[in-house]
Amino acid sequence: DRMLDIENPQRIFIRGERQAILKEDMAASDKVRIQYASKYAQSSNYWKNSIGMSRGIRKLNVKAQKEAQEAAFRKWAEANTLPTEGYMDALDRIREAVEGNASAFAAEQVLREALYRAVEILTPARSFLAVEKITDPARSKEAMRAFYKDYNPATDRRVAKRMMQIVKEKCGDLPTVFAEVIDKRFGGDTDAYVDYLYDNSIFATEEGTLAFVDDFSVEKRDADPAVVFVRSLDAKLLELADAQRENNRRFKDGHRLYIAGLMRMQPDKAWASDANFTIRLTYGRVLPYDPADGIRYNYYTTLKGVM
């Protein structure tokens, strides 16, 4: 439910909004198109994955299959195991953990998708957060030049305005900068705040950032509006992650018991191992895919089909 109701819809919407802005600016300028082609592709990769995943889960009726599996497991656990073994309440642990984390998970995802990943000016600002003294200015400048080579401030400003609107509308737990700065100084007008940030931040331009490297000071860094914002954002993300920690542990314990119970319930079934962090070998027959009546996807692509 969390994937279909929260995670995928939020990712699809937020990335779709950002990608629409990138696409407009890329179409209007060859320079921006070159700068943002890779960024657009990277963002759209998991955006398309989320769309396809949600569609496939619904079309293949995966939820009903999982519910049937859980009902069979619960019946087996009650008839064949002791309460002390933990199998009887494994599914309850999972459900309680997911429900307990729902609001914090949703808020964290909105902040990560809309601000942490989408607003680029925060990247150079964040890179100086822990710096007390620049010991290798040449290396710092090299890193900053690499960032600004593929950065367009006007595009990022447009993205930031839309993302801030989305965060204000959809995030149930906002960073303190919204109440302490945006509401108090800008009357809640996120567009006006974004203009202030980009007009006054050192990190809005390559020239400003390189000059800052030459004349670095902690006081100048801490007063920068992008640094103020990123510190508030990171503090809220840490707070939301901490709020989910206990339920994440409960989920992990419940899931471990559920999988162990399924293996015990079906001892003759061949269970695939977890493929994460392993070298994977695939073998068998390669065949076309028939997702629905009258629809067939072949396992190869032809030039005629592409054109």
Residue ranges of model-derived segments:
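Terminal presequence/propeptide segments associated with secretion/organelle targeting
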Residues: 1-307
